[in-house]
């Protein structure tokens, strides 16, 4: 088996390409502080392989529970011997180069002058990890490992690298039995590892080794990778999965069917372009207004219901609890005036029914006819009176003139009274909202009733209401779908 060199730079930084996987079989001697740490978790030797060092470090981290519970690849060692050893308060198992650097600072490679010590350490290592191998295998293994231990000295020259390649080719010609026995021993090493943080450390290191060996052509150790991946279990998978997550969402594009900038423009371009001034009213939850937030209304303005003793705001005429009508809601004078107005309205309606209307212009043709007939009768009377006066006596012109003037004044007074009565009757029959202009255009009167179901809202002109219906817009007041638009006439 090839054991290439391990070169350590002056500043302690070691690249992953300089540390092939075969160096895990290289024997190293930990420094006193690291040796103390390893012996605290059961190590009993002076020389170890890289596998054993990493294994005991993982056991130490697991024993002291220095890892994070949620992110188990993070190790906190600020107040521990490991922090004094590495010189950092915390580190991550995924930072392979940093781990190599910190470990190699505390290791000394076994020199070529100590073959016996290295041989005994190898035998102790095998006995410790295998536990069930016989003495014959150990003797054969010592014979195999002794010549390879002479290659552990740092050889940065090109000739040493060529020698390592030649040794690799020689070892590739070994017998299948010996190769199988060595593979069996490496499997035993993997099986002896507990499913702890040591596995996580070795797995991360092996992943880095495999990626670096593929890029630089450095030989890797597939036996260690197979052993670790075989016994890693779900404990490592959950840790790796927890660090990875994905969020799926769809970005709205301007070309999608649901969103288009020209959609509203196409709807508005069905007719001529017009500019609208819209007044928006926000409908409340109930028909009555809320007076609780009005600063101008105090508790002294509230009235008490005589039926249920409920305190009610001043404006509603009924009680909010029992719906009893408020006493003395309107003064008596206004009530009488209202009765007189209603009587006048009834008289006006009866007169209008007798006379009739010209729909849709609402012109009163019969009224003008009656006026003309009255004027003609008065003219006939005047002419008759004048003729009689002329035939009787030409000496009384003043009396005839006074009669003419008096008849003309009577006609004017009659017309004034008639127009006043009609105006009063029309004002009493008009709804209050009809006087206000259209809410949308603020120019035309409110004559387009928006009908939905058995109710309707009169808040817009007929033209604006038709546009709302054509564009499938809801009622601006109650947001119900519009069924029809009714042109409303006021007398």
Curated annotation (Swiss-Prot):
<feature type="compositionally biased region" description="Polar residues">
    <location>
        <begin position="149"/>
        <end position="159"/>
    </location>
</feature>
<dbReference type="GO" id="GO:0005654">
    <property type="term" value="C:nucleoplasm"/>
</dbReference>
<feature type="modified residue" description="Phosphoserine">
    <location>
        <position position="246"/>
    </location>
</feature>
<feature type="modified residue" description="Phosphoserine; by ATM">
    <location>
        <position position="386"/>
    </location>
</feature>
<dbReference type="GO" id="GO:0008270">
    <property type="term" value="F:zinc ion binding"/>
</dbReference>
<dbReference type="GO" id="GO:0005737">
    <property type="term" value="C:cytoplasm"/>
</dbReference>
<feature type="short sequence motif" description="Nucleolar localization signal">
    <location>
        <begin position="466"/>
        <end position="473"/>
    </location>
</feature>
<feature type="modified residue" description="Phosphothreonine; by ATM">
    <location>
        <position position="419"/>
    </location>
</feature>
<feature type="region of interest" description="Disordered">
    <location>
        <begin position="1"/>
        <end position="21"/>
    </location>
</feature>
<feature type="compositionally biased region" description="Basic and acidic residues">
    <location>
        <begin position="360"/>
        <end position="374"/>
    </location>
</feature>
<comment type="similarity">
    <text>Belongs to the MDM2/MDM4 family.</text>
</comment>
<dbReference type="Pfam" id="PF13920">
    <property type="entry name" value="zf-C3HC4_3"/>
</dbReference>
<feature type="compositionally biased region" description="Polar residues">
    <location>
        <begin position="383"/>
        <end position="402"/>
    </location>
</feature>
<feature type="modified residue" description="Phosphoserine">
    <location>
        <position position="190"/>
    </location>
</feature>
<keyword id="KW-0862">Zinc</keyword>
<feature type="binding site">
    <location>
        <position position="308"/>
    </location>
    <ligand>
        <name>Zn(2+)</name>
    </ligand>
</feature>
<feature type="domain" description="SWIB/MDM2">
    <location>
        <begin position="26"/>
        <end position="109"/>
    </location>
</feature>
<feature type="region of interest" description="Region II">
    <location>
        <begin position="242"/>
        <end position="331"/>
    </location>
</feature>
<dbReference type="GO" id="GO:0042802">
    <property type="term" value="F:identical protein binding"/>
</dbReference>
<feature type="modified residue" description="Phosphoserine; by ATM">
    <location>
        <position position="429"/>
    </location>
</feature>
<dbReference type="GO" id="GO:0043066">
    <property type="term" value="P:negative regulation of apoptotic process"/>
</dbReference>
<dbReference type="InterPro" id="IPR013083">
    <property type="entry name" value="Znf_RING/FYVE/PHD"/>
</dbReference>
<dbReference type="Pfam" id="PF00641">
    <property type="entry name" value="Zn_ribbon_RanBP"/>
</dbReference>
<dbReference type="GO" id="GO:0005730">
    <property type="term" value="C:nucleolus"/>
</dbReference>
<feature type="modified residue" description="Phosphoserine; by SGK1">
    <location>
        <position position="166"/>
    </location>
</feature>
<dbReference type="GO" id="GO:0016567">
    <property type="term" value="P:protein ubiquitination"/>
</dbReference>
<feature type="short sequence motif" description="Nuclear localization signal">
    <location>
        <begin position="179"/>
        <end position="185"/>
    </location>
</feature>
<comment type="function">
    <text>E3 ubiquitin-protein ligase that mediates ubiquitination of p53/TP53, leading to its degradation by the proteasome. Inhibits p53/TP53- and p73/TP73-mediated cell cycle arrest and apoptosis by binding its transcriptional activation domain. Also acts as a ubiquitin ligase E3 toward itself and ARRB1. Permits the nuclear export of p53/TP53. Promotes proteasome-dependent ubiquitin-independent degradation of retinoblastoma RB1 protein. Inhibits DAXX-mediated apoptosis by inducing its ubiquitination and degradation. Component of the TRIM28/KAP1-MDM2-p53/TP53 complex involved in stabilizing p53/TP53.</text>
</comment>
<dbReference type="GO" id="GO:0045892">
    <property type="term" value="P:negative regulation of DNA-templated transcription"/>
</dbReference>
<feature type="zinc finger region" description="RING-type">
    <location>
        <begin position="438"/>
        <end position="479"/>
    </location>
</feature>
<dbReference type="GO" id="GO:0043130">
    <property type="term" value="F:ubiquitin binding"/>
</dbReference>
<dbReference type="GO" id="GO:0061630">
    <property type="term" value="F:ubiquitin protein ligase activity"/>
</dbReference>
<feature type="modified residue" description="Phosphoserine">
    <location>
        <position position="240"/>
    </location>
</feature>
<feature type="region of interest" description="Disordered">
    <location>
        <begin position="211"/>
        <end position="237"/>
    </location>
</feature>
<keyword id="KW-0832">Ubl conjugation</keyword>
<feature type="modified residue" description="Phosphoserine">
    <location>
        <position position="260"/>
    </location>
</feature>
<dbReference type="InterPro" id="IPR036885">
    <property type="entry name" value="SWIB_MDM2_dom_sf"/>
</dbReference>
<dbReference type="InterPro" id="IPR001876">
    <property type="entry name" value="Znf_RanBP2"/>
</dbReference>
<dbReference type="GO" id="GO:0045931">
    <property type="term" value="P:positive regulation of mitotic cell cycle"/>
</dbReference>
<feature type="short sequence motif" description="Nuclear export signal">
    <location>
        <begin position="190"/>
        <end position="202"/>
    </location>
</feature>
<dbReference type="InterPro" id="IPR028340">
    <property type="entry name" value="Mdm2"/>
</dbReference>
<keyword id="KW-0808">Transferase</keyword>
């Amino acid at each position: 088996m090839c054991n290439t060199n391990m070169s350590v730079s002056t500043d302690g930084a070691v690249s992953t390409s300089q540390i092939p996987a075969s160096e895990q079989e290289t024997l190293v001697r930990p420094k006193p502080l690291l040796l103390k740490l390893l012996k605290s978790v059961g190590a009993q030797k002076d020389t170890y392989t890289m596998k054993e060092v990493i294994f005991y470090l993982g056991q130490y981290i697991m024993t002291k529970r220095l890892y994070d519970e949620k992110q188990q690849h993070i190790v906190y060692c600020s107040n521990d011997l490991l922090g004094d050893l590495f010189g950092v308060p915390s580190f991550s198992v995924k930072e392979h180069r940093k781990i190599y650097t910190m470990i190699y600072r505390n290791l000394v490679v076994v020199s070529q002058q100590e073959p016996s010590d290295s041989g005994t350490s190898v035998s102790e290592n095998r006995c410790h990890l295998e536990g069930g191998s016989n003495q014959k295998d150990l003797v054969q293994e010592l014979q195999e490992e002794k010549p390879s231990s002479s290659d552990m000295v740092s050889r940065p020259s090109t000739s040493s690298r060529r020698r390592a390649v030649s040794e690799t080719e020689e070892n590739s010609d070994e017998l299948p039995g010996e190769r199988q026995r060595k593979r069996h021993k490496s499997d035993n090493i993997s099986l002896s590892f507990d499913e702890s943080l040591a596995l996580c450390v070795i797995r991360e290191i092996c992943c880095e080794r495999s990626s670096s060996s593929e890029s630089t052509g450095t030989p890797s150790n597939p036996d260690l990778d197979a052993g670790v991946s075989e016994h890693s279990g779900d404990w490592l998978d959950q840790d790796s999965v927890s660090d990875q997550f994905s969020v799926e969402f769809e970005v709205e594009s301007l070309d999608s069917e649901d969103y288009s900038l020209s959609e509203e423009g196409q709807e508005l371009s069905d007719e001529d372009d017009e500019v609208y001034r819209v007044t928006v009213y926000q409908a409340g939850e109930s028909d009555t207004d809320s007076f609780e937030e009005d600063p101008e209304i105090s508790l002294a303005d509230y009235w008490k219901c005589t039926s249920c003793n409920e305190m009610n705001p001043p404006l509603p005429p009924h009680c909010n609890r029992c719906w009893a009508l408020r006493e003395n809601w309107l003064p008596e004078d206004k009530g009488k005036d209202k009765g007189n107005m209603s009587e006048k309205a009834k008289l006006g309606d009866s007169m209008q029914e007798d006379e009739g209307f010209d729909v849709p212009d609402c012109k009163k043709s019969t009224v003008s006819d009656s006026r003309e007939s009255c004027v003609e009768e008065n003219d006939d009377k005047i002419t008759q009176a004048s003729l009689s006066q002329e035939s009787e006596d030409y000496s009384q012109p003043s009396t005839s003139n006074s009669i003419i003037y008096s008849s003309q004044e009577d006609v004017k007074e009659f017309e004034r009274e008639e127009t006043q009565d009609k105006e009063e009757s029309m004002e009493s029959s008009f709804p209050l909202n009809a006087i206000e202009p259209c809410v949308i255009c603020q120019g035309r009167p409110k004559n387009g009733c928006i009908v939905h179901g058995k109710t309707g809202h009169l808040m817009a002109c007929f033209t604006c209401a038709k546009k709302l219906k054509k564009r499938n817009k809801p009622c601006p007041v109650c947001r119900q779908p519009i069924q029809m638009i009714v042109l409303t006439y006021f007398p």
